[in-house]
Amino acid sequence: MCIRDSQIPIYQNTTWKYDSSEFMGRLFDLEEEGYFYTRLQNPTNDCVAAKICELEGGSAAMLTSSGQAANFYAVFNIAGCGDHVVCSTSIYGGTYNLFAHTMKRMGIEFTFVSPTCSDEELESAFRPNTKAVFGETVANPALTVLDIERFAKAAHDHGVPLIVDNTFPTPINCRPIEWGADIVTHSTTCLLYTSRCV
């Protein structure tokens, strides 16, 4: 009899067994794909990431420990010390503080523009060292809606990606990639997981 679970198993282990120390070394050096520390990756997380990726219409996904970690990695994998990011003013306060204070101390500058700014104001926010544009689909808590197509066009005209935090609408209500976003983040404990509704 074939048993197919309707729920994925929860892998609780933190470490894995390996056939050789050489293979383990390649894993730790990120030269091989596989599991070596569950905080970074495990089969449960991979399954959840794949489901969210499918819902968003994306090509790849990963889970992080929080929505703030997702936003940090989305920006920090693109921008480093001496770089610049254009960002909507209507974003979650924690994200604003991450960008305006923490990442500023790391040498990344942010220019904040209103999501309802004119095309000229948006254009003037770009610099030669701009590496990305960031916004929230529906801002938390202001509920301001980002014109994803307009911000995507501005980003792409400058050869940089648009990163969109899609926490509030979730991919059930909006799929930013279909409107031009390149990277989508979530705080899954907010609405995807519905922990506040149970």
Indicate where each model-derived feature is located.
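Conserved N-terminal alpha-helix of the aminotransferase class I/II PLP-enzyme fold
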Residues: 20-72, 94-103
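Conserved PLP-enzyme active-site core in the AAT-like
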Residues: 61-196
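Conserved small/polar residues in nucleotide/adenosyl-binding loops
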Residues: 1-5, 193-198
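N-terminal amphipathic/basic leader segments beginning at the initiator methionine
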Residues: 5-21
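Short, functionally important structural connectors and interaction interfaces within domains
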Residues: 4, 29-32, 135, 183-184
